[in-house]
């Protein structure tokens, strides 16, 4: 299809960023919902309440340390992306759940969200139950147009 593919090994700092993603996400969620958590706890959806309950123990120091790891990981990923046009990864570990209660398991895109790198989902095939399964094109921070172009290329190649 006009592309060469190779496997890449990510530096340990990128793996560490993936591990600390929840610190950033949960701390920021707790900050964003602080008023609701304090004033309207019982009116909040149960899943959100549980997540906010689980995030109460993170401190500002935990958050800042995690942000330092994320910044180092973004720099390391930028170094890798100097040698390749795009990273290609699965969008999720399986088919999405049925219904609208959840978008599914986010673990395959949470790193890119943390690092602020563009990632574009491309439907790869339709699984049983008419549920989509996708891949994602990931490019360097700020290279949004490149991610969109790569997604278009992948979409054409998968037709």
Labelled PLM ranges:
Residues 1-20, 57:
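Gly/Ser-rich, acidic/histidine-flanked active-site/gating loops
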Residues 15, 19-25, 104, 135-137:
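Short low-complexity, flexible loop/linker segments enriched in glycine and/or proline
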Residues 76-78, 103-123:
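Small-aliphatic-rich amphipathic alpha-helix that forms the alpha element of a beta-alpha
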Residues 4-6, 23-74, 78, 123-134:
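Short helix-loop capping/hinge segments that flank enzyme active sites or metal/cofactor-binding pockets
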Residues 1, 64-68, 114-159:
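Structural helix-boundary/capping segments
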Residues 21-24, 64-65, 91-111:
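Short, surface-exposed loop/helix-turn segments at secondary-structure junctions
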